[in-house]
Amino acid sequence: IDDSSGYFAALNIGKRSCTVDSDNLEQLICWADIVVHDLSPLMAAEKGIDAIRLFSLKPELVVLAITAFGSEGPEAEFRATDLILGAAGGWSMLCPATSSDPALPPLKVYGDQCYLMASISAAAVALATARDAADTGDGEFIDFSVQAYVASVLESALPTYTYKQEVATRRHERRLIPWKIFHAIDGPVFVACVEQ
């Protein structure tokens, strides 16, 4: 952590880290309950951590693959930044929610929100699956697509389209004030009042 960024340190505070020696990978797998990786299917196979190999070492293992677009389909080998995932998942089109200007291009939300939200949900899924695996002895491969997750949490965008066939737009009408982009002398500034 000494040579890492403040962002990395904040995300990993209180965690123990280790360096994996590929010669001892099998020992580590046999000790683990959950293996988490972010590799595409081909890369996972090249590194020897694809689900088939891991289950041959420990059938009750939970393998969580958090990838940009999932492990199947035409984008399975694609990598993506948070910017790409926000756009591919549809979130960028709703941002900023404070603007009703249709000419404003899609924008990225601050930080790595897509990856952070998806990671929290993926961790919950992995823990629930590990609990089940401990009871049944059956391991499971979890194919977690960040893009699919982002698309699933677009406020009411998905149900609105599903039931009304209406495409969601930026929702600039807010009851809490201020929640708006204000034009200051040196440029726009966004002010949000999320507490009453």
Residue ranges: model-predicted function:
Residues 1-135, 162-166:
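N-terminal helix-loop segment corresponding to the beta1-alpha1 unit
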Residues 21, 96, 143-145, 192-193:
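Short linear motifs in exposed loops
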Residues 68-70, 146-152, 186, 194-196:
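Glycine-rich beta-alpha junction loops
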Residues 129-169:
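Substrate-binding/catalytic subdomain of NAD(P)-dependent oxidoreductase enzymes
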Residues 7-8, 139-141, 178-181:
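Short, acidic/polar N-cap/turn motifs at the starts of alpha helices
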Residues 16, 138, 187-189:
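Short acidic/polar mixed-charge low-complexity motifs
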Residues 161-196:
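Alpha-helical interface/anchor segments and their boundary "cap" residues
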